[in-house]
């Protein structure tokens, strides 16, 4: 069975593999998007690879990719990744917690950035306390900043919210999943983000209460695999990609929460062979 279940009617999205998803986000490949990491490890090891465009016209939906090679075993695994832009009025772009069940640290999502030149920084920490960081510069064209948002865009009220849909690209390519294999999981959700911020006299002012997704929990069977802490810097209608290493057949489930206490969830079975 290759269809996911949710509490609303599902719509097809992104008919293609991982490369097609990157193209949709404006990045043809992780290699093109990410030069050698500019950061250096604080305690040894290799820093994360950070992929994002050098220049973008649309700061409301900037693709960000984070990948890191690190053991993912119970006694030694990459535990968390933070994405930050200290120059922005919403500095934190998210905090992402992983477990050995992820198999590999890979994360792709879309964030809001202010216009002008700035630097996006990724900090990573493993279960033994080692830390790494990588920083890359980006320029958002003048007038293209995505941090303002005091009011909902016309036609984008709460009625435009839809629960998530889970997609497993490997199954769509007709390739079976094997026990212990690391696979991509893509989650698409229709949900607007309102930062509540406006710029007046060159200063950012909070005008209204923000409305946004605050978190995402990923479960496989009864165990929580990942916990993502989200912020108003997340783009509208996000597409989030992460990895999973299923050792047994089971059900992958995602649960989003927003700033008004609502939960939106979906599930998808994983079968081998």
Language model regions located:
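Short edge beta-strand/loop segments characteristic of extracellular beta-sandwich folds
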Residues: 63-71, 184-190
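Short, solvent-exposed loop/linker segments at the N-terminal edge
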Residues: 54-60, 175-180
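Aromatic sugar-binding surface patches on proteins
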Residues: 99-108, 233-241
